[in-house]
Amino acid sequence: MIAYIHGKLLEATDKSCIILTPGGVGYELFLTLSAISTLPESGSDVTFYVHSVIREDAFDLYGFPCFDDREVFRTLISVDRLGPKKALAILSQFGPKDLQDLVFREDVKTLSIVPGIGPKSARQILWSLKDKMETLKSATVRSGACPVEGDRSEFLDALSGLRNLGYGDDEVRDFLKDIFDEEPDLDAGGAIRVALKKISQNK
């Protein structure tokens, strides 16, 4: 079972990346949106904690920049009828702290914004996660060690806002990454304004 990978970033798409290990083997890892958007340039060294999903017809690897994100992912897939793809979609929208807050508030409406999760599924997921709150709390306490650039919630809110304005993810991710690198305390609204200015300057 593969649990940890270190190597060079070979290629990346909007859902996954390929890591070339020192032994010359390339592994494709499925990543969250926030992990994809903070990937360095091709050829850079990268490290991911890995969860392996082995089935008769597939061997899928899910990568996470820190240990705690992987543990939250494992907590999610322990919920009945919640597979790895949907769990990854949830973590693409919400970090450990956000998810803990959703469970505490029983916020069905907010969780239902995740593609593929309707109100009925959201209610079942939140109910199931109540029994697993200790894992979420532990991950929240240690989440400062997770090497994600900028604030994940603000980054994703800014990305969502620009998407609603008609911009594609590929068009604005690099702008937002640079913006949060330069001003990590910026909120989503401020990041959107700066991004729009940069986009207009590059036309």
Curated annotation (Swiss-Prot):
GO terms for cellular component: cytoplasm; Holliday junction helicase complex; Holliday junction resolvase complex. Residues 145-155 are annotated as: Flexible linker. Residues 155-203 are annotated as: Domain III. One of its GO terms (biological process) is DNA repair. Keywords: Cytoplasm, DNA damage, DNA recombination, DNA repair, DNA-binding. The keyword DNA-binding applies. Residues 1-65 are annotated as: Domain I. It is found in: Cytoplasm. The keyword DNA damage applies. The RuvA-RuvB-RuvC complex processes Holliday junction (HJ) DNA during genetic recombination and DNA repair, while the RuvA-RuvB complex plays an important role in the rescue of blocked DNA replication forks via replication fork reversal (RFR). RuvA specifically binds to HJ cruciform DNA, conferring on it an open structure. The RuvB hexamer acts as an ATP-dependent pump, pulling dsDNA into and through the RuvAB complex. HJ branch migration allows RuvC to scan DNA until it finds its consensus sequence, where it cleaves and resolves the cruciform DNA. Belongs to the RuvA family. Has three domains with a flexible linker between the domains II and III and assumes an 'L' shape. Domain III is highly mobile and contacts RuvB. Homotetramer. Forms an RuvA(8)-RuvB(12)-Holliday junction (HJ) complex. HJ DNA is sandwiched between 2 RuvA tetramers; dsDNA enters through RuvA and exits via RuvB. An RuvB hexamer assembles on each DNA strand where it exits the tetramer. Each RuvB hexamer is contacted by two RuvA subunits (via domain III) on 2 adjacent RuvB subunits; this complex drives branch migration. In the full resolvosome a probable DNA-RuvA(4)-RuvB(12)-RuvC(2) complex forms which resolves the HJ. This is Holliday junction branch migration complex subunit RuvA. It comes from Maridesulfovibrio salexigens (strain ATCC 14822 / DSM 2638 / NCIMB 8403 / VKM B-1763). The gene is ruvA.
